[in-house]
């Protein structure tokens, strides 16, 4: 199934704006929220085709929320790409073990992210 709807979960207004502009310009329908809690509320109304997940956020972090999504029958098939400044190999491995399909580090390179999205869809 091609990816059309993307949910961005990132507490940085700058990152949300950059990702929203980039993805909208490439024809994706984008919703951007600033916390895992806000994302959980958003998922009750409509399911995206992909989630871009920051790790370091107030409240529930991105690793925890990705794990929660991967265990829920309603959301377990939605691919998650971790999109974060946490760039250690141990962070990447931990993110993948929590259920993420891929992992990119900030500052995000547009072509790399678009390539990863294309590979999932």
Model-derived segments and spans:
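Charged docking surfaces used in two-component/phosphorelay signaling
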Residues: 17-25
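Active-site beta3 strand of CheY-like receiver
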Residues: 46-52
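C-terminal output helix
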Residues: 107-117
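Receiver (REC) domain active-site loop signature in two-component systems and cognate sites
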Residues: 57
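Short, glycine/charged-rich "phosphate-handling" switch motifs in NTP-dependent
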Residues: 101
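Short hydrophobic/Thr-rich beta-strand motif most characteristic of the beta2 strand and flanking loop
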Residues: 27-34, 42
């Amino acid at each position: 199934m091609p990816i059309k709807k993307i949910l961005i979960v990132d507490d940085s207004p700058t990152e949300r704006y950059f990702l929203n502009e980039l993805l909208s310009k490439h024809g994706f329908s984008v919703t951007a929220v600033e916390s895992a809690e806000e994302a959980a509320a958003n998922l009750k109304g409509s399911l995206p085709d992909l989630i871009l997940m920051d790790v370091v956020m107030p409240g529930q972090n991105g690793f925890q929320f990705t794990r929660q999504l991967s265990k829920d029958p309603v959301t377990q098939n939605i691919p998650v790409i971790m999109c974060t400044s946490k760039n250690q190999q141990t962070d990447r491995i931990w993110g993948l073990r929590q259920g993420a399909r891929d992992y990119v580090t900030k500052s995000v390179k547009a072509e790399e992210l678009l390539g990863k999205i294309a590979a999932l869809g």
